[in-house]
From Swiss-Prot:
Location of the region described as Disordered in the Swiss-Prot/TrEMBL record: 279-358
Native organism: Candida glabrata (strain ATCC 2001 / BCRC 20586 / JCM 3761 / NBRC 0622 / NRRL Y-65 / CBS 138) (Yeast)
Taxon lineage: Eukaryota, Fungi, Dikarya, Ascomycota, Saccharomycotina
Coiled coil ranges: 39-118, 181-215
Protein name: SWI5-dependent HO expression protein 3
Keywords: Coiled coil, Endoplasmic reticulum, Membrane, mRNA transport, RNA-binding, Transport
UniProt GO molecular function: RNA binding
Localization annotation: Endoplasmic reticulum membrane
Amino acid sequence: MSLENAVRVVSTDEKGNQASSTKLIELLHSRVDALTTTNIELTTKLQELLGNLDTVQQRERKLKESAASLRHEGDNVTLMLNRKERKLTEVKEAIVELTTKLGEAKEVNHSLKQKFEDEGLTSEESLRESISEVKTEYDTLVKSHEIYESSNDIQCKSLEDRFSQALLIHGENMKALDGTAEQILANNSELVSQLRATENKAESARTSIRNASIDTAAKVDLEKWLFLYKEAQRICEEFASKTDTKLPDELQAIIDDPVLKELDARFALDEIQYGKTRNKRIPSNPLLSNSQAAARRVASPSANYSPRVSSAQGSLPGITRTPSMKVNNKFSDSNAQEVPTRLHSHGSRSKRSSMVFK
C-alpha cells in the first residue's frame, strides 16, 4: 500500500467515519518505520558497495601501472631486438663483402703466380742490363766530378791571390786613416778646450744671475709677505666659516694660486732642512729667546698662526729681524735646476732667504 493510497483512504474515511483515523495513523507509522529500516539497509549496502568500488579502483590502478611498466619494458626489449637485428644484418653484409673480396684476392694471387712463373727468367736478364747501365752512369759521374774539382782548385787559387791583394790595399788605407784620425783628435782637443772655456763663461754668468736673484729675494723678504698672505687667508676663511658665507671667486682663485702654494711648500721644506741641520750642529739651548722662536714660526708656513703677532712677525717687508739664521747648503754643478739658500749680511743686519728658484 502506497502513501497516496493511504491519503486517499484517509480522505474517504474522514468523510465516512472519523473514528478510524487513529488506525490509519498507526498504519502510517508502521509504514514509515518499515521505510526507514529499508532505507538504513540500502545505505549500508551502498556503503559496502562503495568500499568494494574503491578496492576495485585501487586494484585497477595497480594493474594499469604494472601494465605501463610492462609496456615500457616491452618497448625496450623490442628496441634491443631491433638493434641486434640491425647488427646481425650489418655483420651479414660485412661477411658477404669479405667473401667477395677474398674471392677477388684469390683470383689476383693466382694471376700473379702465373705472371711470376712466366716472367721469372726474363726478369734476371733485365736486372743485369739495368745494373750495367747504372755502372756506366756512375763512371761518367766520377769523371765529371774530377773535372769539376780541378776547375774549383783553379778558381780557389785565383781568389786567394785577389784576397792577398785586397789585404795589401786595406793596410795602406788603414795607414792613411790613422793619419787622418790623429788630425781629427788634435782638432777635437782644440774644440774641447773651447767648449770648456764657454762652459766656464756660462757658469760665471749663471752664478752672477743666481747671486743677483738671491739678493733681490733677500731685499723683497718673501717670508714676511708669505706670512701676511697666510694670515689674510686665515682671517678670510675664519670669517667665511663664522658667517657661513662663500668667498668670492676672485678671492678663492688668489687663495688657490699654485705659485703661492709652491712657495709655501718650499718654505716648509727649507724649515725642515734648517731644523735638521740645527739639531745636528747646534745643541739645544733652553735659554732660546722668544724672538728666535717667533722667527722660526714665521719661516714655517705649516705652523699654526695666531691672531696675536709678535713684534718680529708683524714688521712690514723691508724691516730687518733681530734673529740671525744660517743655512748651509752646497751647490752641485750636476743639479743646476735648484739654487740653494744663502745668507747675505748687510752691516749689522742678517737676513735668511729660503727661496728656491728653478
